Amino acid sequence: PGRGGHTMGMAASREVYRCRETAAEFFHLDNPGQVVFTLNCTMAMNMALKGILRTSGRVVVSDLEHNAVMRPLHVLSPGRPIYDVAQVTPGDDDQTVEAFRRCITPFTRAIVCTHASNVFGVQLPIRRLGELAREHDLLFVVDAAQTAGVLPLDMEADHIDFLCVAGHKGLYGPMGTGMLLCGDRFQLPSFVEGGTGSQSLLYEQPDELPDRLESGTPNTPGICGLRA
């Protein structure tokens, strides 16, 4: 039905918002407006990484990261290395956490890690890594492509600032759907600018979420399928 003030457009907008509410409740995020719909988990991760590292800084990643993490980091790092790699020790969370701790420098801005490897199935101790991030006043970004809908995820208890989710895996949604759930500790800049169905008289991208990170016609059928 498209967007707009007509009956079908408003009904579609309400359905999209219901999906935000469902996702926020499921992943323990207080504000449904901070649920951003994306094409996939890869897009969500690009939005988080390129926003956090837009000007400077480094991140700590695990040695099990997907290319959705590593390729954006390589694009961001010509001539200036911007990540340190922590070795995961399967079956020994203490060693894994200490490996991340050793990689933290005064220039580190975030810990970025997968919840579980798509190759080996190794699960990382994200709650402890989230605690480590808070201990050092770092952001915590989690790639939950493999685990959302399969393993428990609690953005508040796990201290997650940005949760990147695929819709078509454990959430049983359509392909071509994903989400970036955003906490309050860091404001990502706009990623793609354009129409949002709001504040149309302004040339500037709206500052509030989700409009700051959602431009163009949304995938309303896919989003509704994700909620279903």
Language model features: what each stretch is:
Residues 1-228:
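Pyridoxal 5′-phosphate
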